[in-house]
Amino acid sequence: MNTPHIIPRVGIATDAHQVQPGKDCWMACLLWEDQDGCEGHSDGDVVAHAVVDALLSAAGLGDLGSFVGVGRQEYDNVSGERLLRECRELLESKGFVIGNAAVQMVGNRPKMGTRREEAEKVMGELIGAPVSVSATTTDHMGFTGRGEGVAAVATAVVWQAQN
């Protein structure tokens, strides 16, 4: 009798977008009032995008660009929420179970600490697994420190049964 082995897989990813004055700020699947959002083909949610990329990386399924592309009209201004939901559906269809994800936003704004638990809850429900959210600044160094953009770094763990 062949007993299946559970093989954990780890993925890592980054995302960065330039701040776009006047655009709605979506970060960690939350709308941040009175904050400028990030440019992009999508809603500019670097936190959600980094988690999607880390999940795809862990499963060996490419990256966000290969997942949705930038030329597909149905993904114009797509939300991070939709990307996380569709990524979860893809992974589950390929036999993967999401273990957890961790993501750190790098930038001056929005101030993630005030809504960190809310972000973890929303994103965790979308992927069906715990999500840890944190944030840091770069002490005024680089494009994130000057407020020109926001970045995020994420890791994710998934499992797939192997015979």
Curated annotation (Swiss-Prot):
Pfam families: YgbB (PF02542). It catalyses: 4-CDP-2-C-methyl-D-erythritol 2-phosphate = 2-C-methyl-D-erythritol 2,4-cyclic diphosphate + CMP. Binds 1 divalent metal cation per subunit. Gene3D superfamilies: 2-C-methyl-D-erythritol 2,4-cyclodiphosphate synthase. The record marks H41, T137 as: Transition state stabilizer. CDD domains: MECDP_synthase. Keywords: Isoprene biosynthesis, Lyase, Metal-binding. GO terms for biological process: isopentenyl diphosphate biosynthetic process, methylerythritol 4-phosphate pathway; terpenoid biosynthetic process. Pathway: Isoprenoid biosynthesis; isopentenyl diphosphate biosynthesis via DXP pathway; isopentenyl diphosphate from 1-deoxy-D-xylulose 5-phosphate: step 4/6. Belongs to the IspF family. Homotrimer. This is 2-C-methyl-D-erythritol 2,4-cyclodiphosphate synthase. It comes from Corynebacterium jeikeium (strain K411). The lineage of its organism: Bacteria, Bacillati, Actinomycetota, Actinomycetes, Mycobacteriales. The gene is ispF.
